[in-house]
A protein has these predicted regions:
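A generic secondary-structure signal marking the coil-to-beta-strand transition
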Residues: 29-30, 151
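Thiamine diphosphate
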Residues: 37-206
Length: 206
């Protein structure tokens, strides 16, 4: 049928992991459920009476006024940490959006946020080339370029195969520091404005 479409879901917390999985089971169309292994040890409250979730809708997990920060999956926790530091140490109010679904993309929610903030940062674990961030940036530029007061910034992994060693893996993947630096750049601030720099504060907040 022409109405059949697939969904690609990426949970970021134990609670929405349950919500997304239940929604995937009930959905009549094909669904791919991506669960990052880095989330396996994560603990959190999972109420029995969680409300149903719309597979096509992203979630604004934190409201803000200065910068829109879009993320999903394991990177969402890092995005929230960076947003905390940006607000506390630099006075930058960051609106954080959890995509939850990377197919389809909830562009109306992103457009509404960018219209409010004028600045967009996209953070994901994958490399930037050919990634979800590039697609979101392209759609925002194509459809609502007039909303933007600066360039769209992306945060992603280095363009190299992911190594097996955890130490080298940390070197390849982006984290709180890179996200914070991008948020501050979008807001027109510098990471060296504080006493210890962005890296130290983001690491302490993690």
């Amino acid at each position: 049928s022409s109405d059949v479409c697939s969904s690609d879901l990426v949970p970021s917390t134990p609670a929405n992991g349950k919500q997304l999985l239940k929604a995937a089971i009930k959905d009549p169309n094909p669904v791919i459920y991506f669960e990052n292994k880095g989330l396996f040890p994560v603990k959190g409250d999972v109420p029995e009476d969680l409300p149903p979730i719309d597979l096509s809708r992203a979630q604004v997990v934190r409201e803000g006024a200065d910068v829109t920060l879009v993320s999903y999956g394991l990177m969402l926790t890092k995005a929230l940490t960076a947003a905390d530091v940006a607000r506390r140490e630099y006075g930058v109010s960051v609106e954080v959006i959890d995509l939850r679904s990377i197919t389809p993309l909830d562009m109306p929610t992103i457009y509404a946020s960018v219209k409010k903030t004028g600045h967009l940062v996209i953070a994901h674990e994958a490399i930037k080339i050919g990634g979800v961030g590039g697609e979101i940036a392209a759609r925002v530029a194509e459809n609502h370029f007039d909303y933007l007061r600066g360039p769209v910034l992306r945060v992603g992994a280095r363009f190299t195969p992911l190594p097996f060693s955890p130490v080298m893996e940390d070197f390849v993947l982006s984290g709180e520091k890179e996200i914070l630096d991008a948020v501050l750049a979008a807001a027109g601030k510098s990471a060296v404005d504080g006493a210890d720099g962005a890296a130290g504060r983001a690491g302490e907040a993690a």
